């Protein structure tokens, strides 16, 4: 309510939850709040548009329709990194996550101040996380919701979510 944001659930229902829509929200969530920079500090005041971790980018790539493997004319698996959609999605995601304050990779293996705790503390508008992370959000003061990773653009026919023990969704 504080930011007068578009409802992500409605964006999903309308097929308008895209990388551009997510980025618009991310920009609204970034604020120094008196800090000198967006360098992470557990006791800092800066807020971020989106805090994620390593597989969060994979979730965004898959959501944007990028495929790591596709089938050839004989229905055999082939590497798809040279596919135009993969390049387009990777390029757009790279530009989104390279903006200071709008995205921060807060990987547990590199930093003990894990992305889940930053989200729980209200230091980020959104995160890309595993469903299991929601168990740590139960007593949060802020409301949150769960939506699929965004589509590349509105012309993409459906939302894609991958499933593995480490699969991430947008929260």
PLM segments and residue spans:
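Periplasmic solute-binding protein
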Residues: 1-9, 51-74, 164-171
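Extracytoplasmic/periplasmic substrate-recognition and gating elements
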Residues: 101, 137-171
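Glycine-centered hinge/linker elements that transmit conformational signals in sensory
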Residues: 19-28, 58-108
């Amino acid at each position: 309510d504080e930011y007068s944001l578009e409802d992500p659930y409605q964006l999903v229902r309308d097929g308008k939850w895209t990388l551009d829509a997510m980025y618009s929200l991310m920009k609204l969530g970034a604020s120094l709040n008196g800090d000198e920079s967006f360098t992470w500090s557990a006791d800092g005041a800066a807020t971020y548009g989106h805090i994620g971790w390593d597989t969060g980018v994979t979730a965004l790539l898959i959501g944007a329709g990028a495929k790591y493997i596709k089938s050839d004319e004989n229905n055999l698996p082939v590497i798809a990194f040279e596919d135009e959609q993969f390049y387009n999605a990777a390029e757009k995601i790279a530009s989104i996550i390279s903006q200071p304050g709008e995205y921060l990779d807060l990987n547990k293996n590199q930093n003990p101040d894990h992305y889940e705790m930053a989200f729980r503390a209200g230091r980020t508008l959104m995160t890309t996380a595993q469903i299991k992370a929601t168990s740590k959000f139960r007593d949060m003061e802020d409301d949150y919701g769960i939506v699929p990773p965004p589509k590349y653009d509105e012309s993409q026919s459906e939302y894609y979510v991958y499933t593995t023990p480490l699969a991430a969704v947008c929260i």
